Amino acid sequence: MSYDERANAHPNLNDESDVEEEALVNDYREQVNFDDGMSELDRTTSLGAASQTQDLQAQLAAAATPLEYQATLETKFASYDNYCSLFHYILNSDGPVELEVPSYYWAWDVIDEFIYQFESFCRYRNRVARSGSNEEEAQLLRENPNTWGCYSVLNVLYSLIQKSQINEQLAAMKRGEDPAAFAGEYGSRPLYKMLGYFSIIGLLRVHCLLGDFTLALKTLDDIEMNKKAMFARVMAAHFTTYYYVGFSYMMTRRYGDAIRMFSHILVYVSRTKNFQKGGNSYDAIAKKNDQMYALIAICVALHPTRLDDTIHSALREKYGEQLHRLQQGGPEALPLFEELFRSACPKFISPTPPDFDNPALNVDPVDHHTAIFMDEVKNTLYNPTIRSYLKLYTTMDLQKLAGFLDVEPEKLRSWLLVNKQRSRQVRWVEGGLLEGETVSANDLDYALEKDLIHVSETKAGRRLVDWYLRNLARVY
């Protein structure tokens, strides 16, 4: 797809007329609605219909092949053109493309690599703009602001979903109806069905990278999070889905749901790791595995809860001392919270091109989201200390507690009110991922009556039957 004077950067591409460029601008204004049917891809530098059909198998294989790590900027531009050419052919051909999918996981590989290249290009572009050290590359990027554009990538994913009518099929399955009745001409083909399905997972990932965590969770409304789901058949897709869902829950302060998501996939991985060794995605899964343990450590520090024995043992082994420091709270824990968050969070991207003329104005998206998260952590820094005092009393004077903590009474009152509000979390029960019921996240509750604090504590009994069953299974 040759946009914005790409001809100057790539002499072999055809020049575009002023009329086409004006039409492109109009397309991008409308793309936020994602209902234009990929019409802008008509301006893609692509093969003719006959030759493209003959070479489609090669294009499909190339689309699922990772780009070299040290690929040049021209190679990244060319890769974008190739993806646009491929998706244009699949979406805008006269009727469905009759093609046998190379493998059941091929569609995931295509969507995964497409989004990875988009993510890495955005981060690279932001890095060049902020450093201001390579004027030649900065000029190329400045002249091609729509290459790997956010709207283009989102438009591809939404178009694949709409073309395949995959959401309608999934909704029918949840109602116990025949999905084939809702598939339509395109959705009945495996090529479109699989691309559409994994585009939903792709949207979850992209919206999370852009920082819209609520919309990220909303995209999975029609997908059931269980082992029977289609994404569970592809280990990398299975892992990716739970990572981004769990992270989105964490960033929306639903720590209990985040822990549940992370724990589910980590237990699954611990039971299947011997089968994964030697696989193409083993290293990537191992890295994400460590990241999720770091995120669980953060969530448990912010939302103390009982973990699965397998997760608890692994967490103690990996982050024993660090977890203890996180749970102690206080200003000393802040650097550790930030370190773990930066090491485990997605590599966030900006939805718009950077300002190449004013490098100082460009903000690293990771820094931005880290600052937002750390503001939340600062609100809960003294919760462990406050809890340790409140657990000793049923009623306590505000002035007395302020004296123990060496803070002003009104500041303590503010902390208590914030903590009580934060302790009310939404917990998923059924339905969409955003749905749930509001519950108290702590086993310690309190109420303020002027300067008197009334404390109540509920202790959950140990489920000894479950403990015995798990350990008997290990012995026998």
UniProtKB/Swiss-Prot annotation:
Signal peptide: none
Record's keyword annotation contains rRNA processing: no
Domain of life (superkingdom): Eukaryota
Domain PCI: 257-452
A GO biological process held by the record: formation of cytoplasmic translation initiation complex
Protein localization: Cytoplasm
Pfam families per UniProt: Paf67
Gene Ontology molecular function, alphabetical: translation initiation factor activity
Keywords, in A-Z order: Cytoplasm, Initiation factor, Protein biosynthesis
InterPro entries reported in the protein's UniProt record: eIF3l, PCI_dom
PROSITE patterns (UniProt xref): PCI (PS50250)
Cellular component terms (Gene Ontology): eukaryotic 43S preinitiation complex; eukaryotic 48S preinitiation complex; eukaryotic translation initiation factor 3 complex
Function noted in UniProt: Component of the eukaryotic translation initiation factor 3 (eIF-3) complex, which is involved in protein synthesis of a specialized repertoire of mRNAs and, together with other initiation factors, stimulates binding of mRNA and methionyl-tRNAi to the 40S ribosome. The eIF-3 complex specifically targets and initiates translation of a subset of mRNAs involved in cell proliferation.
UniProt family annotation: Belongs to the eIF-3 subunit L family.
PANTHER family membership: EUKARYOTIC TRANSLATION INITIATION FACTOR 3, EUKARYOTIC TRANSLATION INITIATION FACTOR 3 SUBUNIT L
Complex and partners: Component of the eukaryotic translation initiation factor 3 (eIF-3) complex.
Protein name: Eukaryotic translation initiation factor 3 subunit L
